[in-house]
From Swiss-Prot:
Any one cellular-component term (Gene Ontology): cytoplasm
Major location category of this protein: cytoplasm
Pfam families, alphabetized: UreD
InterPro entries: UreD
Species the sequence originates in: Anaeromyxobacter sp. (strain Fw109-5)
Assembly and oligomerization: UreD, UreF and UreG form a complex that acts as a GTP-hydrolysis-dependent molecular chaperone, activating the urease apoprotein by helping to assemble the nickel containing metallocenter of UreC. The UreE protein probably delivers the nickel.
Function summary: Required for maturation of urease via the functional incorporation of the urease nickel metallocenter.
Name listed for the protein in its UniProt record: Urease accessory protein UreD
Keywords: Chaperone, Cytoplasm, Nickel insertion
Compartmental location: Cytoplasm
Gene name of the encoded protein: ureD
Molecular function GO terms recorded: nickel cation binding
Family (UniProt): Belongs to the UreD family.
Length: 297
């Protein structure tokens, strides 16, 4: 039996592997880093670059359409002490992007090291970025820091949600972590228009449980720009028309921003708080064409 000429096989093996426009995750990235670029291509929003390095994972259930949808995840569903995760997002002019998470982010117990997470996003003129992750849950003894900065061109829009759960409530944990710090900055045309921070550290003032009696979830929403201005006005009016009651299950307060609002929510149960947010943010599907609270697009 004659053996076939091995040369064509060798040429095939030596040929570069075809790709789908996504470079190898480990090339040029430190551990936990990622980058996503979204652009307007032939009338649709499309992911034109997407790369990540473990423990960060990036999924693209809807890479092209009215809205490009990116889901971030991590191995094990959370961050260990010492993990540093950072993501850069660029949304080109006229594009629409939805950034969410696969599930809630768990922050595991630490013996001193801090788990950190960063997001840096640029949003072009006429573009919209909706950053709507599931809540963060800090376990007993956890240490977590988060920095997020959004740079918007004139005429760009942003919808941002940040939520924090008291901990593993079913196990009796309530605000038992060792450190939680979160900061957001938003700039429009190079000028900072919003800087907001939340710092919860035991030992700094009264116990956290005493400061947040009965509260299981805290959330902040920022809506800015022409794409969400109308919905923001309606939400502002709706919150203003609902006077806060001392024993209410969900408390909400809203402050007007130019072309938007800042909404704060405190809930006595995680379920009630999430239901409130889903209801108040139902307009997202109309402006993006995607449901951020659905399991799949």
């Amino acid at each position: 039996m004659e053996c076939p000429d091995p040369q064509p096989i060798l040429e095939l093996l030596e040929a570069p592997c075809p790709t789908i426009g996504q470079p190898r995750p480990e090339v040029g990235l430190r551990a936990g880093a990622g980058r996503v670029d979204i652009a307007r291509v032939d009338g649709a929003s499309a992911i034109v670059a997407c790369v990540a390095s473990s423990p960060l994972q990036l999924l693209a259930p809807s890479p092209r359409g009215r809205c490009a949808w990116i889901i971030s995840a991590s191995h094990g569903g959370g961050l260990l002490a010492g993990d540093e995760v950072s993501l850069e997002v660029d949304v080109g002019a006229g594009a629409v992007a939805l950034l969410s998470t696969q599930a809630g982010t768990k922050i595991y117990r630490s013996r001193g090291e801090v788990a950190s997470q960063g997001l840096s996003a640029r949003v072009g003129a006429g573009a919209l970025l909706a950053a709507l992750p599931h809540p963060v849950s800090c376990f007993s003894g956890a240490r977590f820091r988060q920095e997020q900065r959004f740079e918007l061109a004139r005429g760009a829009s942003l919808l941002w949600l940040d939520a924090l759960v008291a901990g593993r409530i079913a196990r009796g944990e309530r605000w038992a972590f060792d450190e939680y710090r979160s900061r957001i900055e938003v700039a429009i045309d190079g000028r900072t228009v919003l800087a907001d921070a939340l710092r919860l550290v035991p030992g700094e003032g009264p116990p956290i449980v005493a400061r947040l009696p009965g509260v299981e979830l805290l959330a902040t929403v920022v809506a800015l720009g022409p794409a969400v201005a109308s919905a923001a006005r309606e939400l502002l009016e709706r919150v203003a028309a609902s006077p806060a009651e001392r024993d209410a299950g969900v408390l909400a307060a809203a402050s007007p921003l130019r072309d938007g609002l800042l909404l704060r929510v405190a809930s006595r149960s995680v379920e009630a708080g999430l239901a409130f947010l889903r209801q108040r943010l139902a307009f997202v599907e109309a402006v993006t064409g995607a449901d951020p609270f659905a399991r799949t697009p």
